Amino acid sequence: IIDYAAKSDAATPVNLTSHLYFNLNGNASGDISGHRFAINSSERIVTDRNLIPTGMKAALDGTPYDLRTPTLFSSISDKLENGFDDYFILETAAPGFMDAMAYSEKSGIEMRVYTKELGIQFYTGNFLDGTVAGKSGYRYGRHGGFCMETMGYPDAIHHAGFPSNVLH
């Protein structure tokens, strides 16, 4: 469980998240090509070539970004330019409804994500290149792990159509 809190005495933009990497096969087990992912989302935030939100949204139907059913990463990774580094807008659901999941058939481990946040930044380690040492000195290569970062809309302060992330 990850639980954050913030307090301020003035209006302050706040968008707390965590950039923890996971590989459900364990440390030093290669890439995440054998993982299945699901996210309860029908839209994502569009970004420019520098991965900065443009303020636009894109429907996911019929695209490799549609992860409403568990999808094997290796079956769609070649359809994406680099993998995922995208903010998925979560569907409104009842409290206690699972917002996302990851599963490895190899290990049998399933990770479930529940959040009160509006979305998830889903990242598949596209820029991991083996230069940074992780646990036990293992060097993680491209797609060596994934992140599911629950948070409010990224860059909301610059887009009037996005829900505000300002703490009052």
Language model feature labels by segment:
Residues 1-168:
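An exposed, glycine/acidic-rich loop-and-rim segment of catalytic or binding clefts
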